[in-house]
Amino acid sequence: MEITRQFIRTFVIIVGILVLLSYVYGVSKSDDATALWGGIPLSWTKFIVPWMFIAAIGFLMYWWTILYSVDASVIDNLRWPWGESDGKGANRLLLTYCVFMIPSMLWLESTQFHMNNEYSWTPFLVIGILTLASIGNIMFGLLAYSAYQDGVEGAGTMLLGS
């Protein structure tokens, strides 16, 4: 199957909606939404929440730049910084979105599962899911860095967004 820019756009929109719905569902299902902060003092949330919005803006900057602003051929030429371009950049980009967005859809539910059960393995589930999302974010940065190395217009925005 050939991965196209339009396919990635559609994937990101559908999965992005599912991520947002998982947040709405998770928060609405929680008896105590403050417990989702995991013991972080509520006084800290005034510092954390703005960074959540900055992260969301960065995601949108990257998304807009790579999927709408640059030429479609740029996507095919995306590579890892240590490799050469082989025309499979769309595959790398889709993999990156998958590794970032699918765990983003699952972390809140896994956190609630952990809070509601006494199993010894649930912390590893939550940490594993969040680690995958973090790896996806690093992958975004690596693709942006290689685009920057290749002189792609908008790569600086992608780096800033990642």
How should each PLM-predicted stretch be described?
Residues 1-16, 46, 87-94, 125, ...:
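Alpha-helical transmembrane segments and their helix-start/interface "positive-inside/aromatic belt" motifs
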Residues 2, 29-45, 111-124, 150-152:
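Membrane-interface interhelical loops and short amphipathic "cap" helices
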Residues 15-31:
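Alpha-helical transmembrane segments of multi-pass membrane proteins
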Residues 41-61:
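Interfacial helix-start motif at the membrane-water boundary
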Residues 57-74, 139-143:
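Membrane-water interface of transmembrane alpha-helices
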Residues 71-136:
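Membrane-proximal helix-loop-helix units in multi-pass membrane proteins
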Residues 134-162:
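Terminal transmembrane helical module of multi-pass membrane proteins
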